[in-house]
């Protein structure tokens, strides 16, 4: 078992706001892994972030982000508890980071609970069909399919996506860190992502004809 140092306990305490003994117990349970210990505290509701999640967050900000010369645009709404925090540089920076994440990672939902049941059922069905094609035993099809759906969530649910600036963190971790630092409940409510020309059928032209037109060789 890894030795739990006072420095590790202090680091976890500063990050989560939990008590010293709770931090030490969490680190012991997590085998000295700080990230896992933080998760242990969150699950037990002992971290500062966990204690704040039940509080009403009705203030906040709507931010926009335009990427690639106007080809991708994002609107995102992030809520906090007070207008004072909503106007701080730290909160505004967080909202901007979330908007950039949406632009870069193309999530479809904020959290897994928003994914329609029929979409989940279809993903399970596809995963099982693929496993059967690979001659996997029927007894483990459900386990394989569940694993595939978990991967689906991590790809398309914003809160479970790897952060584009540090893939060791999920967006949920980024939010948890912000809650602990800012001191208020913070929630990502919704987002919209726009891609120029998405869903439109582009006219396909012959490359040779295009070159000829550009050179003035065709009328």
Swiss-Prot record:
MF annotations from Gene Ontology: translation elongation factor activity
Coiled-coil regions listed: none
Subcellular location: Cytoplasm
InterPro entries, per the entry: EF-Ts_dimer_sf, Transl_elong_EFTs/EF1B, Transl_elong_EFTs/EF1B_dimer, Transl_elong_Ts_CS, UBA-like_sf
Region span, Involved in Mg(2+) ion dislocation from EF-Tu: 82-85
Record-level GO cellular component terms: cytoplasm
Superkingdom of source: Bacteria
Principal place of residence: cytoplasm
Transmembrane stretches, start-end: none
Keywords: Cytoplasm, Elongation factor, Protein biosynthesis
Function description: Associates with the EF-Tu.GDP complex and induces the exchange of GDP to GTP. It remains bound to the aminoacyl-tRNA.EF-Tu.GTP complex up to the GTP hydrolysis stage on the ribosome.
NCBIfam families, alphabetized: tsf
Family indicated by similarity: Belongs to the EF-Ts family.
Protein name: Elongation factor Ts
Organism: Anaeromyxobacter dehalogenans (strain 2CP-1 / ATCC BAA-258)
Biological classification of the source: Bacteria, Pseudomonadati, Myxococcota, Myxococcia, Myxococcales
Gene (UniProt): tsf
